[in-house]
């Protein structure tokens, strides 16, 4: 008999998501409980969902204040009694056979510590969502389709053995709205077990576009807040890289301001700004042609804005919140295997070189005028 506790922290408390989760097919000889943690005291719990709470198979916990998904998951872990814990977000629609898929994987591979599947987004509906796909910022949501194993997985769709969790919990230092806490949690488990999570490309949940696909960069700024905290917790997965577009703009515009004062002209600032921005978009366009094809390369502008918003959050955290000056050009290897660092450095170096070259070209052009 396999026992599974499904832990769902919920701020939204929407029946359209919660009910399909607790109505997933339960395989034979599998004992499943659903632990829902209501994390929004100001939101009334829907009656149609409340009628399904029996405090045996469907158990509802209510936070007295909004604590965030990470602390809410800890409530679930503290009350979990099952052999396995399945984390699901409250804004996904799981495939009907999700638990069956995980149960079969557990039976086939009882010695593995955990498994994770894909979180699938709809087809892009506008230029912004096409840019999200093009820039690869969502890679880890569907990485189970083309990776074999990984040290961590998004908590939208991952199951892990309870005995391997032990006393490990989601750290409270991470932002309430999310970012980095899932990486930290699973890396703690990896440090303890030295075993990675196995990928299941047939374990699927479906996620709608945030804000219905409307342009919004706050989420990606916020992600980097939490990610930046990982640098000091897991320094073995950090590395230095060439300045990104936001770092280059910040320091380039700062130093060019002295030339503006000296020349009594705003021209140096404009030259630096144009050189960096044009270089970034040009190289990103070329990169996308090489790896994504001409069709997706037209969304290089959109993808660059998304990545830049993420870089803004990272620079703010390093310099303002954490006051880590030496962390400015520091990056976190999210694959946690150091296999992709060389690739990242090559493209970052090409981009940084383009900033300098295009700035010089613009300067010489204006000088001739």
Where are these regions (language model features)?
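Short, well-formed alpha-helical segments that are part of the catalytic scaffolds
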Residues: 12-26
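Glycine-rich, basic loop-to-helix element that forms the pyrophosphate-binding segment
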Residues: 63-80
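Short aromatic/hydrophobic "clamp" motif used to bind/position activated sugar donors
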Residues: 85
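Conserved donor NDP-sugar-binding/catalytic core segment of glycosyltransferases
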Residues: 97-129
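Short, flexible, basic/aromatic active-site loop/helix in glycosyltransferases
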Residues: 117-118, 132-150
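A recurrent flexible, glycine/aromatic-enriched loop bordering the glycosyltransferase active site
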Residues: 142-160, 177-178, 235-238
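Catalytic donor/gating beta->alpha subdomain of glycosyltransferases that bind UDP-sugars
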Residues: 173-237
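Membrane-embedded multi-pass helical conduit in multi-pass membrane proteins
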Residues: 249-321, 357-369
């Amino acid at each position: 008999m396999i026992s599974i506790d499904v832990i769902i922290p919920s701020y939204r408390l929407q029946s359209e998501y919660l009910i399909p989760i607790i109505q997933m097919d339960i395989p034979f000889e599998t004992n499943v409980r659903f632990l829902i943690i209501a994390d929004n005291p100001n939101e009334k719990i829907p009656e149609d969902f409340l009628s399904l709470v029996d405090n045996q198979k469907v158990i509802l916990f209510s936070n007295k204040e909004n604590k965030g998904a990470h602390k809410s998951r800890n409530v679930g872990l503290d009350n979990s009694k099952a052999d396995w814990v399945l984390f699901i977000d409250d804004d996904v629609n799981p495939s009907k056979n999700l638990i069956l898929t995980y149960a079969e994987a557990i039976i086939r591979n009882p010695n593995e510590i955990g498994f994770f599947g894909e979180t699938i987004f709809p087809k892009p509906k506008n230029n912004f969502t096409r840019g999200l796909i093009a820039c690869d910022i969502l890679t880890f949501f569907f990485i189970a389709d083309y990776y074999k194993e990984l040290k961590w997985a998004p908590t939208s769709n991952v199951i892990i053995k309870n005995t391997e969790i032990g006393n490990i919990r989601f750290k409270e230092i991470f932002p309430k709205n999310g970012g980095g806490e899932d990486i930290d949690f699973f890396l703690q488990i990896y440090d303890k077990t030295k075993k990675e999570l196995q990928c299941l490309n047939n374990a699927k949940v479906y996620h709608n576009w945030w804000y219905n696909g409307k342009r919004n960069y706050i989420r990606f700024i916020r992600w980097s807040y939490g990610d930046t905290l990982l640098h000091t917790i897991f320094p073995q997965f950090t590395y230095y890289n060439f300045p990104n577009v936001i770092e280059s703009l910040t320091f380039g515009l700062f130093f060019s301001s002295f030339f503006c004062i000296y020349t009594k002209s705003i021209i140096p600032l404009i030259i630096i700004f144009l050189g960096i921005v044009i270089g970034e978009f040009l190289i990103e366009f070329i990169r996308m042609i090489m790896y994504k094809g001409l069709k997706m390369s037209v969304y290089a502008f959109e993808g660059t804005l998304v990545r830049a918003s993420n870089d803004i959050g990272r620079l703010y955290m390093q310099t303002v919140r954490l006051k880590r000056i030496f962390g400015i050009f520091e990056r976190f290897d999210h694959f946690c295997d150091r296999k992709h660092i060389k690739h990242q450095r090559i493209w970052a170096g090409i981009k940084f070189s383009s900033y300098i070259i295009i700035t010089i070209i613009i300067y010489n052009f204006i000088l001739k005028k």
